[in-house]
Amino acid sequence: MQTLADLLNTIPAIDPAAMSRAQRHIDGLLKPVGSLGRLEALAIQLAGMPGLNGIPHVGKKAVLVMCADHGVWEEGVAISPKEVTAIQAENMTRGTTGVCVLAAQAGANVHVVDVGIDTAEPIPGLINMRVARGSGNIASAPAMSRRQAEKLLLDVICYTRELAKNGVTLFGVGELGMANTTPAAAIVSTITGRDPEEVVGIGANLPTDKLANKIDVVRRAITLNQPNPQDGVDVLAKVGGFDLVGMAGVMLGAASCGLPVLLDGFLSYAAALAACQMSPAIKPYLTPSHLSAEKGARIALSHLGLEPYLDMEMRLGEGSGAALAMPIIEAACAIYNNMGELAASNIVLPGNTTSDLNS
């Protein structure tokens, strides 16, 4: 059986030769050079991913939603009852939540994964990878053991790779868990080195008079657990949560297949920071969807070196932003594969990247 280290070592490098070929192809399409902006850059990025074999395309699409409760909820860092995690997970099986509606619109399947919901029995219709009934309270103990974190990472990586074998070429990540912006902020603060006050936000509408307590909880969690910012697994195990571990696993699994994965919002940025500490080679496979409205979003994205494609003032989570951005990936593939070529129309354009083809 493969270990986590074995799987991390399988992540392929981006193919620069394929990207160069894609650049030449795109420059020869029926348009001024560079006139489709970031859509062109996205198509070139996709062409370099070995899992797509040099041709940007989208097969099956999947959004994987990692669901878990958090012991830190007991610290008063969220206003929603903890039971909402289980209720919303059930609603996802009915297709009635935000991510389900947006994923259906994008033609993507939603995989709802229980990695740590606090219920006596598993919830019917969910993929059961439950490690425990919620993580530990990071304000007074580690979220989980390193062994638990590594096993869950491995399980999710293997599940993601199996989906890729069955034709999924575009992944999105999402999460569900009351109070989970608190461990996410702890991860972002730890890895970026920024003070908790700079990255802690209101999450799901936390009243501003409770924000100081949330900042204090994050600071206490980091001080108590002393996560090593250079060790992504250590950070996740000490101040993270099962949902954050699960998202990191999807990213690592998709990258190990040479396939793109769309990030969602703030929670996914935190998971991506930890995943990149485990394997910097995954970064070219991470595609940002939207700019989360959560306070620490820009700090996390800047550290990752990523610029989102959308700014919709969204902070729902669930994978909603990832689902919303899937048509952008498909648009990049469409221009690459379906546009005509300048040479075929006997058009010669000067090397002016700002000119309009019709001017």
Curated annotation (Swiss-Prot):
GO terms for biological process: cobalamin biosynthetic process. Its EC number is 2.4.2.21. It is an enzyme of class 2 (transferase). CDD domains: DMB-PRT_CobT. It comes from the Bacteria. The active site is at E318 (proton acceptor). It catalyses: 5,6-dimethylbenzimidazole + nicotinate beta-D-ribonucleotide = alpha-ribazole 5'-phosphate + nicotinate + H(+). GO terms for molecular function: nicotinate-nucleotide-dimethylbenzimidazole phosphoribosyltransferase activity. Pathway: Nucleoside biosynthesis; alpha-ribazole biosynthesis; alpha-ribazole from 5,6-dimethylbenzimidazole: step 1/2. The keyword Transferase applies. Keywords: Cobalamin biosynthesis, Glycosyltransferase, Transferase. InterPro entries: Nict_dMeBzImd_PRibTrfase, Nict_dMeBzImd_PRibTrfase_bact, Nict_dMeBzImd_PRibTrfase_N, Nict_dMeBzImd_PRibTrfase_sf. It holds the Pfam family DBI_PRT. The keyword Acyltransferase does not apply. Belongs to the CobT family. Homodimer. Catalyzes the synthesis of alpha-ribazole-5'-phosphate from nicotinate mononucleotide (NAMN) and 5,6-dimethylbenzimidazole (DMB). PANTHER family: NICOTINATE-NUCLEOTIDE--DIMETHYLBENZIMIDAZOLE PHOSPHORIBOSYLTRANSFERASE. This is Nicotinate-nucleotide--dimethylbenzimidazole phosphoribosyltransferase. It comes from Escherichia coli (strain ATCC 8739 / DSM 1576 / NBRC 3972 / NCIMB 8545 / WDCM 00012 / Crooks). The gene is cobT.
